[in-house]
Each structure stands twice: as C-alpha cells, then as structure tokens.
C-alpha cells in the first residue's frame, strides 16, 4: 500500500474515488460542502431525500457527480461533529476501506483526515488513518491450503490536510504510521503462528533476521548451556519439560549520536506454548496459549518499527523464548529454584512460569547498565479480570516512567492503567521454605506477580506491562492484536524528541 499527503482543493481531484465526510444529522463537512457547490447542490439534495443521515460508519457511493472530475465520490457518515473520538475516527476510516474495496478503485483521495477529532492534530489524523487502514486489511492465511478469495485492494491512498503549514507534520505522520503499522503486523504474524512452528528457536531466527536486515542492529542468542553457566536456573526449570530448548535472543539497536548512551531495554516474555506444566491448564481454549509469547512478539514488532523510523536512540530488545510442558523431567510444585541473582523461589504452581523466566531475564539485563527497563508479558488472568480487554496493566517503581508510559498510551490510543506495587503485597509472597513463593494467593494476583518481578529490578528504573487481556482476541475475531507495539513505539518517539 502506498500512502502520501498533500494540500489540495477537493474540486480538482481527478481520482478513482474521492472520500469526504458527512456529519449527523445530514451536515456536510467542509470538503463535502465544496463538492456540493461544484455539483450545484447534488449532494445536499440526496441528503434531504434521506439517502444518508450521517451516522458514524454509514456510507453512500456516488457515480457521475455533476462537474466533479473524480470517477466516484464516497460519502462517509462521521456522527456528531463535536463528539468525534479517536475510536470513532478509526472506525470511520475502516468503513471507508470496506466500501472502497468493493468498488475496484485503485486510488483513493481521502479528505477524512481534515475532520476535527477531539484533542488531535493533522499528524494524528494521518497516522491513525494509516494504522486503521492497515489494521482493516490485515489477514493471516499462511497455513490455509485453500486461500480465501482476496478482494481487489486499492493500492494508493492520498490524504489531504487542510493547511499547507501542516504538511511537514503530516509527512512525519506518514513515516511513523507506516513503520508502526509494519511493527504491529510483524508482531501479529509471529503471535498468530502455530506453536509447532513458532518455538523458541524460531524466535531466535526472527531476531537474527532483524540483524541481517538492518546495519545498526546486532543480535546475540543465548542457549541453555550459557544460561546454565550464568545461573539462570528459574528460566531453565520452566524449559525442562519441553523437547524444544529455550533461547534468549538479545537484539541491540544502536543509533544514538552518543554511542555510549545508556540503552532503553525492552523485555518480552516468550512462552511459545504454555500448557501450565504439571499444574496443567484446562483443555478449553488451551490452543490460545500459543499467544503466551505476546510480550516477545510485541518487542520484536517494536524493534522492527524502531528500525524503520531510524530513531536516534540505543534500544535493546530481549525475547525470552521458552516452552512450558509436562513430562518426567518437568519442574514440580514444591521445587525450590535458585535464581540468577541468588534469591530462592518456591514453586507453588508451575502455571505461574512467566515470572520465573522473567526474573532471570530481568537480572541478565543488568549488564547493559540501562537507562530504564520495560518488560511486557501475558502474565496473569487476574489482570484480565481486573481490566478486561481494553487496558494493559502497568506497574512501575518509578512515577516518572509510569507517567511517561501512560502519556504514550493515551497518545497512541493503546490504553494502559496503572496498578499499585508496595511492601504490603510483598507479604503475600512469603514462603516457609524459600525467600519467595512464585504466587501470592487469589487476591490481587496481577499485582503480586508484578511485585515478585520487582525483587529482580533493584538496580535500574523499571516498569511492567501485563498484556494478558490485550495481546489477543478470542471468539470469532480470534487473533493477535499487536499490542502494545503502538504504545512502546510512541514512548520511544517521545524519548527521541525529548533528549
């Protein structure tokens, strides 16, 4: 898909399909008003006759509009002008995609980017439009022997901005929107891949692929022998029951003007399949446990977006690849594990494995002397119960970092909600036989999981994103979401802008 921006007059657009908005009730947007004048009231006459009310998502395709050089004019309902939100705007763009795809048009000139979205600028309108279009066109059919009939997709979208002075921002939005959409798609592809293909070795190969593609990326893969030498016993315990060995993939992106600048480190839980181990999960929906590597997928997608945007930062992405399976060699409830930093953990439930993989990974990344560390993981069902499928759970030992992430989440429309940490939650992690227990009981399960991780982050600024509710969708819309690639990408954009 080719995207571009311009500042032009709606009356002069020679294109296969010209798209303008109509507000509710039957109110023309500025671009639609200009077309109506050019067509001598043709559009307003149709609205008076009741052909389109202007409710959000309604569409009306017109051919041969008098005096208009475009082959087609698509009217898109935008709802009430003063109530247009980011969510509604994206839905409107996706309705446009659906309608245009049924016409056979190869090119679209879109004036919907001129709409006023609450608290947003032309930059956001263009970027959100690209993200919404790419989201709408995404499909994953790699393993279907009979491919679905592919609709004839348009190949080019030209976004119009109302003011010439906004063109530079719109061009920047193009760059960011395309890069972030690519990162989201890469994350979704990896997460949707079946676990008999996507195992820890597969994640390691993907990480190596980034290094082969980009000159400023270097990848190092840590195997189980090296993990054992490092004392990563908690990580290795989780892997013991699987025939697929664990691999820790370290992706180093260096593009800061100061090559010695401290890196931002992103850590992703990469459980390519989580059966629960000896504490085995119920069979219902166990197939969705291929998504337990959603954290690693989002780090991979973010590193891809980062490289495409060429941001002047030093960033390290870490994919903690592992598989949790039951067999005669699997770790057990009651086992006590000595972690890389020396703390011991009693295993009360082998299905609380992600935190064991992460605690050693979070210790491992100390060697990079990071500016900050953000880990993301499909960690707890408790977070899904608390926040549902709309907000990722955020925990942090730093108010500054937490606020920066919440700001990026709001900007990117990739929402997060902060949950507390504190010594009172540490009490729930007490063990009679070890320094820590790997679960803290039913109450506050998402928080106690984050609190456990905090014991391994004392040497740097840290935040944790629990994406168990946001990394994928179930039911008829089953599939990975690519979250929180947009949030992380925006966080990195902000970091680059403010240094």
UniProtKB/Swiss-Prot annotation:
Mn(2+) 1 binds at residues 274, 351, 353. One of its GO terms (biological process) is proteolysis. Its EC number is 3.4.11.1, 3.4.11.10. Signal peptide: none annotated. It catalyses: Release of an N-terminal amino acid, Xaa-|-Yaa-, in which Xaa is preferably Leu, but may be other amino acids including Pro although not Arg or Lys, and Yaa may be Pro. Amino acid amides and methyl esters are also readily hydrolyzed, but rates on arylamides are exceedingly low; Release of an N-terminal amino acid, preferentially leucine, but not glutamic or aspartic acids. The active site is at residues 281, 355. Keywords: Aminopeptidase, Cytoplasm, Hydrolase, Manganese, Metal-binding, Protease. One of its GO terms (cellular component) is cytoplasm. It is found in: Cytoplasm. Its main location: cytoplasm. Gene3D superfamilies: Leucine Aminopeptidase, subunit E, domain 1 (3.40.220.10), Zn peptidases (3.40.630.10). Binds 2 manganese ions per subunit. It is an enzyme of class 3 (hydrolase). Mn(2+) 2 binds at residues 269, 274, 292, 353. Its cofactor is Mn(2+). Belongs to the peptidase M17 family. Presumably involved in the processing and regular turnover of intracellular proteins. Catalyzes the removal of unsubstituted N-terminal amino acids from various peptides. This is Probable cytosol aminopeptidase. It comes from Actinobacillus pleuropneumoniae serotype 7 (strain AP76). The gene is pepA.
